[in-house]
Amino acid sequence: TQPENTDVCVRSIERFGHQVTLLDKKDLERDYGYNREVEDGSTEFTYTRFLVPYLCGYKGRALFCDSDFVWRKDPAILDTIVQDASITVVKHLVKQVREDHKFLAHKNEWYPRKWWSSMMVFNCDHVECSALTLDAVNTQTPQWLHRFEWATDIGRVDESYNYLVGYYNFLKDPVAVHFTDGTPIYTDYAQDEFAEDYNDLR
């Protein structure tokens, strides 16, 4: 991932008084025994995100989001609307990607439940989250993880909490915007919707 994107995302959350914990692959390998290799076209946190319940000791709630998010409003809003599902996401219905490749030449493919795992509220106490062990995250298939084959109790929040820039155009004031194909630091995306929100935090 790009450090500047991460910094912007973190600032967008910390300005509301929240602490952010980054999922650093090297730290997870050293401290916890994470050993999954990164496949071609994947980012380092493609799979580490599913360690969140394990890292939280299967207690409480935890929010994960990709590093190309900007939170325009306090993410704590989610705590007031999320119910008791094992995992809560935006259940995107987009059926195709905008481009074959995105920033850093990562391959951009559509698959069922694409983008659902880019913003997740884990109910770490839920019995279904107990399936996300270190061994499972190290060894299970990408489909099992990202298509939520480990969960049946999947909650939903609306698109305001994971607004896909370049795909959606129906919200004027979303809570969180997701520059999924590329952030405004890249020329091709410099004029994208909500680029100003990103640039204000650079």
Language-model-detected regions and their locations in the chain:
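Flexible, glycine-rich active-site loops centered on histidine and acidic residues
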Residues: 21, 100-103
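GT-A fold catalytic core of metal-dependent nucleotide-sugar glycosyltransferases
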Residues: 48-97, 121, 128
